[in-house]
Amino acid sequence: PIPYATVRLSEKEGTGTITDSLGRFSIPQVPVGRHTVEAAFMGYEPGIFREILVTSAKEVYLEIPLKESVNELNEVVIRARTNKEEAMNKMATTGARMLSVEEASRYAGGFDDPARLVSSFAGVAPSVSSNGISIHGNAPHLLQWRLEDVEIPNPNHFADIATLGGGILSSLSSQVLGNSDFFTGAFPAEYGNAVSGVFDMKLRNGNNQKNENTLQVGIMGIDVASEGPLSKKHKASYIFNYRYSTTGLLNLEGGKMDYQDLNFKLNFPTQKAGTFSVWGTSLIDKFGSDFEKNTDKWEYMSNRSESKDKQYMAAGGISHRYFFNNDASLKTTIAGTYSQLDGGAILFNHSLESTPYMDLNSKHTNLILTSTFNRKFSNRFTNKIGFTYNAMFYQMNLAIAPYEAESLETVSQGKGNTSLISAYNSSSVGLTERWTLNAGIYGQFLTLNNKWSVEPRIGLKWQATPKATFALAYGMYSRMEKMDVYFVKTKSTGDKSVNKELDFTKAQHVMLSFGYKISDRMNLKIEPYIQFLHDVPVMADCSYSVLNRSDFYVEDALVNKGRGRNIGIDITLERFLEKGLYYMISGSLFDSRYRGGDGVWYNTKFNRNYVINGLIGKEWMLGRNRQNILSINLKLTLQGGDRYSPIDREATMNHPDKEVQYDETKAFSKQYSPMLIGNYTVSYRINKKKVSHEFAVKGLNFTGAKEHYGHEYNVKT
């Protein structure tokens, strides 16, 4: 915290304040509308947050980071610039972007879901039915989800049903989410166990001055949020958000879905012992599909199948941060995560007799200790060092019938515990006033099979002119597989787990970056990149690779002999909100390939080749005192179509259940027509003295773009 810094509203002369000894501030009687907040302190570059929305019913909570200036001139005038386009993590050199809470409330198609919001950024391919994040042609499950500096299980409702690594809607509501970092490649040394990207999310602190409550009702369900002080004297606060939905309007491939989630954070600052926080997120999902009781209407196998699934996910922890004067801090977190999936499917014959087709039970519990020590030795040199110990407990059993009416056979089964241990050291060095070097090293060790990896990371940034910036970053990365992969069993091996000795999937990222500040409100960023993947688990003598994995299970023996290569360029032109108008155009051109166990190179499943996004929004201040806000937001996405493998018709006809078989020698060689996805949001906010009302209509995929789910054999035709 920086004491006695100046904070003011830039557009209103005489409206401002000074932070107290703990860096806290409050500006009373701010008019309703958009405002720009500036913070300044001697020896630091000014920080600025533009177009912050102030409403009548909720106070705005801001954490304004200031970067120490390395300029050695006796006197210098620094023009305040927005840091919205940069990551909060100052050791990020390329491929990083901050997702602000303010954006979360504006972008069309976001549905208050951070995973869908980042699909507007360059390098990310969006989906309609799923919020899975595919970066540069990588599968969504290769991304790491983090909350409060801890890796957490997939935090999405109906996780891994539509796409492994994604879901339908995030359990983390924008009501409680704070400013967060999103990385698309070449990320700093403190991040590991990820090969495509990292979504580093934070929960914000609640209002420590007064209670505020929010109620939201829509077709998705009921959303209740509350925040306020636990102790005004000690500035302790709480915030929580609960959502509940039981609606038949939601459907996934003919199934009904119910969901609920809870998020919270308790914050306890102290005078001498640092700051303590207790936080958590959780969800419960139910999904089920019924079979068609009229046998005359049976056309596909799905018509005579019935399934029921129930999912649980929870993550929570206790964090403590202690500042040693103003140049060092220690943050330690003890956390736990839990995920459970219970599911089953049965098939009916024409006599309406049922036989089991699939049975799944899995429980995963992680107990985590992580600690980071950050030290600023000077205004030119900062070092960060940390470690994480993750004790993983697992119990899982998956059984599938090879053919209809046959007995279930075990596909994956295991019970026990293992550990993933990691450590890193990362430094940022201001070589000169224009050159910055970020370098570090990360390592991890898996006790399950004694596999390890040591990964250097380095980035160099050059401020060529006040408006132009060049950067280059390189890093090595690795990721362990989901636990079920290690415990796959086959007929030939009996009770022996065939994949227990699998090594990490590894990757190397190289990314260039050019940023140009066209004006205070407009930025251009161009980032070419190349990613090499190696030691990828593949099936021997086959085109299968985990780089294309989208199903929730693997049933074959794998070897670390696969490769991958992603090459492309990301371009973003963004005009930040000013006078009620903002827009962003982002584009990605890329080619994503992989080499299977047969030694042949193929397109990856997620190789769309291009993604172009266009966002625009406009706000009008209405009402007698211009206190109400009408907002219209639009997003259009044009992207390459879904890829799929051609059907092997002869093999399909010879299959006892007529299950569709694919020609794996031509994996993902087919592609559907390009997709045009349109989303919109229209909202009107009425600000009264102590309450505000917002009415909104949100449309997802109003253009009717169709996605590829798969193929089914029609038994009638």
Question: Model-found features: residue ranges?
Answer:
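Transmembrane beta-barrel wall of Gram-negative outer-membrane proteins
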Residues: 218-244, 254-287, 308-330, 334-336, ...
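Short acidic/polar hinge/loop motifs at secondary-structure boundaries
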Residues: 28, 152-182
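A beta-strand signature from Gram-negative outer-membrane beta-barrel systems
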Residues: 63-64, 168-212, 223-225
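C-terminal beta-signal and adjacent terminal beta-strands/loops
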Residues: 583, 637-659, 672-679, 683-717
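Surface-exposed extracellular loop regions of Gram-negative outer-membrane beta-barrel proteins
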Residues: 151, 156, 292-295, 340, ...
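Short, acidic, small-residue-rich periplasmic hinge/interaction motif at the N-terminus
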Residues: 5-10, 40-45, 55-107, 115, ...
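Outer membrane beta-barrel strand-and-loop segments of large Gram-negative receptors
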Residues: 362, 366-370, 411-422, 499, ...
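Gram-negative outer-membrane beta-barrel transporters
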Residues: 530-532, 553-640
